[in-house]
Amino acid sequence: MYNESPIIRRKSSRIYVGNVPIGDGAPIAVQSMTNTRTTDVEATVAQIKALEKVGADIVRVSVPTMDAAEAFKFIKQQTNIPLIADIHFDYRIALKVAEYGVDCLRINPGNIGNEERIRSVVECARDKNIPIRIGVNGGSLEKDLMDKYKEPTPEALLESAMRHVDILDRLNFDQFKVSVKASDVFLAVESYRLLAKQIIQPLHLGITEAGGARAGSVKSAVGLGMLLADGIGDTLRISLAADPVEEIKVGFDILKSLRIRSRGINFIACPSCSRQEFDVISTVNELEQRLEDIVTPMDVSIIGCVVNGPGEALVSDIGLTGGNRMSGYYDDGVRQKERFDNNNIVDSLEAKIRAKAAIVASRIPAQDLNK
């Protein structure tokens, strides 16, 4: 059953990336990044649309060259979701994509160049009402900071971020968010905690270069979970060496587990043991695949026996408790007379879940359905 999170979020200012509000209590935006060649417009557009289909709020696109900037023009024309241009080294690329309707510019303080170049980007962003992300990364800190600190430290990442926050402040530009990413969980977490005390701007969270699908998901869940539980974070990206679509799914799963933002079904399922009366694992896997299209937030418990099944079903929108040949079915925590044949559980449960999703959706205001 859908419950509010007890987490009190950090107060922050509000910016907009396209039509997506960021900060000041807005839903935490989930984003990913394309891994296609940006000059391959067809492939990049296809990937952006795939990300949008699974719920991405924002997509970042790497724009490493002027050729990529020209391709970005056509990518933007063929997509609807807000796009962030990821800019490194050459500030002129930022100026070029600004002409093509980019929704946000990500610049890296470690390589974007001197203050005069940043000024050019800021003035362009101001003229076109484009927000900026100051994206600090432990792997690409400025040389003088590496000389000073010898290695990436929370203080080094903070100093890099604040150096550029100060530049934007002097230029009277407040439409920005900041990230201080690192591949080490503790380094990233402490960096964000320090930064959160220094500025009021929205924070974009991420554990950079987290790893493959399994290890990267775990590392991201631990690091981002620590920050989100403290109320820190306004947008996030799960960085995986995997299909970007998985980044969106994991991102929503993390938010869902903290009851910060729910999209789709929260499956509560036992790991199964010799007491199970039906194959829990295959049942859950099949239902997850079949029901990916449901965006309504709801809890479904699938428990293989009567030890924990009834208790979990009491706090679920739909609950299933394994029984001998026939399994018990619960709706809104109430045991129903109807029982499910263990040989046909998936089809029966899918029908009930879809019907229940429509009922739950009708109870939630339309503007809150994707919060």
Curated annotation (Swiss-Prot):
Gene3D superfamilies linked: Dihydropteroate synthase-like, Sulfite Reductase Hemoprotein, domain 1
Key words, A-Z: 4Fe-4S, Iron, Iron-sulfur, Isoprene biosynthesis, Metal-binding, Oxidoreductase
Catalytic activity: (2E)-4-hydroxy-3-methylbut-2-enyl diphosphate + oxidized [flavodoxin] + H2O + 2 H(+) = 2-C-methyl-D-erythritol 2,4-cyclic diphosphate + reduced [flavodoxin]
Metabolic or biological pathway: Isoprenoid biosynthesis; isopentenyl diphosphate biosynthesis via DXP pathway; isopentenyl diphosphate from 1-deoxy-D-xylulose 5-phosphate: step 5/6
PANTHER family on file: 4-HYDROXY-3-METHYLBUT-2-EN-1-YL DIPHOSPHATE SYNTHASE (PTHR30454), 4-HYDROXY-3-METHYLBUT-2-EN-1-YL DIPHOSPHATE SYNTHASE (FERREDOXIN), CHLOROPLASTIC (PTHR30454:SF0)
Known function: Converts 2C-methyl-D-erythritol 2,4-cyclodiphosphate (ME-2,4cPP) into 1-hydroxy-2-methyl-2-(E)-butenyl 4-diphosphate.
Protein name: 4-hydroxy-3-methylbut-2-en-1-yl diphosphate synthase (flavodoxin)
